[in-house]
Amino acid sequence: MTDEKRTVGENERIAIARAVIYRFLSRCFSHPDKDLPGLFDSARIEEFLQSWRYLGLDAEEAVARITNWLTRYPDYGTALLELDKEYTRLFITAYPKVVAPPYSSVYLDKERLIWGKSTAEAAKLYEAAGLGISENFHDIPDHIAAEFEFASYLISEQLRDRDNSTRITALDQIQKDFLIGHLLRWSPEFLSRVAEFSQIPFYQVVADLAREFLVLETQHLEKVHH
């Protein structure tokens, strides 16, 4: 179905699905906490699966791989220890180097360091959209989890303010600048590294899901901003 032939209601449902998936990915790439394994409980995962299906994609098998992996452990606490260990190895302290740094500046900036020019650019886009960094977020603004959450926020704000044409136009430009000019330029390389180097199914599967979704996002944005 082309964008031109969709009804307003269909476009809104697609936007909701996109926001749900970005929020889910943000949660998966955040530092693991006690609630993360529970994200895959049957009742909680259904919203994600429905959103995935609405976009014409199938995540059932991928989610089953994660839930099967989680059931190997006697409880969520044990699974969480494994997630925390792998998160640290992939994103923080692997030797001799971090295999998948989760920051845009490492991929977009010539220096390939954290807290680079791209970090400041991401923070400026957050500010332009009226969003500040939460006091509960203890990382760098261009962390992949923060950027996925920001993408979800932009889409949700457009839905909430759909009767405010000025706000919608501003958010649409920010979304274009952020997704096309920033997130989609570096996330594929990052996700490829995660899929290649992760030693547990959780991050392998989530990285593959994110890559599949972002291919669809690229196609969607090319149509919208043709």
Regions found by a protein language model. Give the residues of each.
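Charged, alpha-helix-forming regions
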Residues: M1-H226
